[in-house]
Amino acid sequence: MLNYTELENKNVLVVGLAKSGYEAAKLLLKLGANVKVNDGKDLSQDAHAKDLESMGIEVISGSHPFSLLDDNPIIVKNPGIPYTVSIIEEAAKRGLKILTEVELSYLISEAPIIAVTGTNGKTTVTSLIGDMFQKSVLTGRLSGNIGYVASNVAQEVKSDEYLITELSSFQLLGIEKYKPHIAIITNIYSAHLDYHETLENYQNAKKQIYKNQTKDDYLICNYHQRHLIESENLEAKTFYFSTQQEVDGIYIKDGFIVFNGIRIINTKDLVLPGEHNLENILAAVLASIIAGVPVKAIVDSLVTFSGIDHRLQYIGTNRTNKYYNDSKATNTLATQFALNSFDQPIIWLCGGLDRGNEFDELIPYMENVRVMVVFGETQDKFAKLGNSQGKYVIKATDVEDAVDKIQDIVEPNDVVLLSPACASWDQYHTFEERGEKFIDRFRAHLPSY
């Protein structure tokens, strides 16, 4: 960790605890700042809050009193806290500096950064790059939205290692100096409009990933969305990926992944399922090549890497039916990819938090859907969708009940796919919890020998 002294004796207010706020507060204390933590929820019984208080950090919870801004603190905002929260709006009015925990990770480390963002595919790309590093002599440390708090990992990473960081639009909004050596934008579609309010705001948040890059850095983008960045004043070297045509970067030709005229691997040898994952693979391969990962290590990864938990994750077979856990599909685009990944009849488990979306854009991808099992707040919307397409629709109370209900109607070689197309927060704390419940219920129905 760098000997970073700019926050020494400065007043810093961490808004929003959770995991990243907790780690940020501890780091700020280590950097010599005068730290307070504020959260709108009551944290009187929270273990992390009590731990911070034992270190001498004042925790104010249950409301957002503006008096916390009177000593002109630097604000470190948990990425999940919208800028429309009252205390953040007031801080902005007063002209106070507002950072996120990811910015701290950059300030305290000299390690080069590979940063990955996008509406879909960012977790897969981040994990795959990490696996490619692991297969080589180079060291890459996963961090960010993938589950490892960036500022925590940044304290441990060495200057000759890479930080491989997944970034959400929430995290990117608060960057000031953050500069990845290699930035990847997998794709940008409409998402999180409940947070960003407009598609333009969401797109602009994603574009923050390259705003500080120089001519010595690299930007990797989807060729078929190049219009989103072509008008920008880019300094970084820009490369593209495409599954459809030759581009300045990496592409697929005659069934092979090709970079710089060199065939890397035949796509038939890839283990990761789904047509959409070809784009994720191209982005990961290109970033790893730029970072210096040997081609042999890249190929070793591609012939063994089968994906990440909760993203089109194959969890097993019961009788002749393969089960796939795609709980991380919290929007319709991710579910489009999932439905498009199978030629067999699909029993589709879907539903969740109602964000006001309609789901008609899924209709072109429902050809192979034989049965829909619907649950959650959007249950009636999905039932209406299924009925309009002549699908057999079953209503369930939750994911576990959905798995129970299909046992008597599943037919040989049906694929059972959990791909909710919705967030999980109506019934589960996280998409991971929802996915684990699905896996547990699948296992409960396995025959015992």
From Swiss-Prot:
GO terms for cellular component: cytoplasm. The keyword Transmembrane helix does not apply. The gene is murD. Cell wall formation. Catalyzes the addition of glutamate to the nucleotide precursor UDP-N-acetylmuramoyl-L-alanine (UMA). InterPro entries: Mur-like_cat_sf, Mur_ligase_C, Mur_ligase_C_dom_sf, Mur_ligase_cen, MurD. It catalyses: UDP-N-acetyl-alpha-D-muramoyl-L-alanine + D-glutamate + ATP = UDP-N-acetyl-alpha-D-muramoyl-L-alanyl-D-glutamate + ADP + phosphate + H(+). It is found in: Cytoplasm. The keyword Transcription regulation does not apply. Its main location: cytoplasm. Pathway: Cell wall biogenesis; peptidoglycan biosynthesis. This is UDP-N-acetylmuramoylalanine--D-glutamate ligase. NCBIfam families: murD. Belongs to the MurCDEF family.
